[in-house]
A protein has these predicted regions:
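Conserved C-terminal helix/tail region of periplasmic/extracytoplasmic solute-binding proteins
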Residues: 308-363
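N-terminal signal peptide c-region/cleavage motif recognized by signal peptidases
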Residues: 25-27
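Secondary-structure end/capping motifs
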Residues: 233-322
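A glycine-rich, aromatic-flanked flexible loop/lid motif
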Residues: 18, 212-219, 280-286
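N-terminal secretory signal peptides and thylakoid transit peptides that target proteins
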Residues: 1-17
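Pocket-lining segment of extracytoplasmic ligand-binding domains
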Residues: 95, 175-177, 185-274
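Short, glycine-/small- and polar/acidic-enriched structural segments
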Residues: 29-182, 186-193, 209-210, 216-217, ...
Length: 363
């Protein structure tokens, strides 16, 4: 029988010591990394950039996980895939997840990725439209299939303008942004998180009047899993959320390095002439939406139960459709795994400085 030499044993001990220094949990050392499947809600872009950083910078590995990242084809499809158990974890637009839950999908939001869906009205940067009232008498491009469309009447009511005096131009969402740059319409109803990077990265300056500023507020995107997993595998859920939130803190304080990591992981983005700028602006906007009281007071990922209730009630009233029922919000949202990752004063200062160039788009 072969007996290991003292030198070999010392090498093993040193290796274990270096792993321990990385902060890996005992199960990760003893049993290897736990394999986890995760789907984003869309193609690689700013709002899901954190996932590639969490994977490739080692934040998930540090928490004992080997996470595969799949690209999604929309928040609705991503939510359904998670609810069905096709993926262990996912992400999606929070309003869409609430709608799916209201229709009976078993799903739980386990951490906020960002805090504003940036629903609003996009106009050229030099447009004379500076407030919602200015939309009266103008052409507003809108797509009935887009998530913000059902809330236009509520926005008009809250922002103090007469929607009947606005000329609504129905557009396919694929040509909506282009219609604005070609001045076929004066403004568009859209998600700023998508439209702003799309237009600004190709040289078309744009700014948004946000629904949020009129009191119509919705969270941006949530991490999701199945309710059963929260109960059966809380340690895996905790490791997944912790790694994601550490990555979000990193992309907010070191956005340039984060962007480099993302581009190396997604060649198709870096190969296009506007791809890097598209990702940079998308990341900046996502980071901007995370500098909110929820994060500053309670840590990254924390969801305000009062806001969740108010947002869910609006979604049920305006967007969920027939047959939808108010989901059990205590099951739909949990803060069990969040609140542990926070900013130091120095990190917060860096994060605030890094988002300044992006405020002009939503000022």
């Amino acid at each position: 029988m072969h007996h290991p030499s003292r030198r070999q044993l010392l090498k093993v001990a040193a290796a274990c010591g270096s792993v321990g220094a990385l902060g890996l949990s005992a199960p990760a050392i003893g049993q290897g990394l736990t394999k986890v499947t995760f789907t984003t809600s869309w193609i690689p872009e700013g709002p899901n950039l954190f996932a590639y950083v969490a994977r490739d910078k080692g934040f998930w590995k540090k928490n004992g996980l080997d996470v595969s990242v799949a690209r999604g084809s929309g928040s609705g499809a991503a939510a359904q895939a998670v609810g069905a158990g096709t993926f262990m974890f996912g992400m999606g637009a929070t309003p869409t997840v609430i709608i799916q839950a209201a229709k009976g999908l078993p799903i739980t939001c386990i951490g906020q990725i960002n805090y504003d869906a940036l629903m609003g009205i996009g106009v050229p940067a030099n447009s004379p439209i500076t407030k919602a009232k200015d939309l009266e008498g103008k052409k507003l491009g809108a797509s009935v299939s887009s998530g913000e469309y059902p809330f236009l009447p509520l926005y008009a009511q809250k922002a103090g303008f007469d929607l009947s005096k606005v000329q609504l131009v129905q557009l396919d969402s694929k040509v909506r942004d282009r219609s604005l740059t070609e001045r076929l319409v004066d403004a568009v109803a859209a998600f700023g998180s998508s439209t702003i990077p799309s237009l600004a990265s190709t040289g078309s300056d744009v700014r948004f009047l946000l629904f949020k500023d009129a009191g119509v507020e919705f969270y941006g995107q949530s991490l999701t899993t199945q309710p059963a997993r929260v109960k059966s595998e809380p340690a895996v859920c905790q490791a997944f959320v912790s790694g994601a939130m550490e990555a979000i803190r990193f992309i907010m304080t070191e956005p340039d390095e984060a962007l480099d990591i993302f581009l190396k992981a997604n060649d198709e983005v870096s190969m296009t002439s506007s791809g890097k700028e598209y990702a940079r602006i998308g990341l900046g906007l996502a980071n901007l939406t995370n500098l909110v009281p929820e994060v500053l007071q309670n840590g990254l990922g924390w969801a305000d139960p009062a806001k969740v209730k108010a947002q869910s009630e609006l979604i049920l009233q305006y967007a969920a459709g027939q047959g939808a029922k108010m989901p059990d919000l205590a099951q739909l949202f949990t803060n069990q795994f969040v609140g542990k990752i926070k900013f130091t004063d120095a990190e917060l200062a860096k994060a605030r400085k890094s988002v300044e160039p992006f405020r002009k788009y939503v000022a």
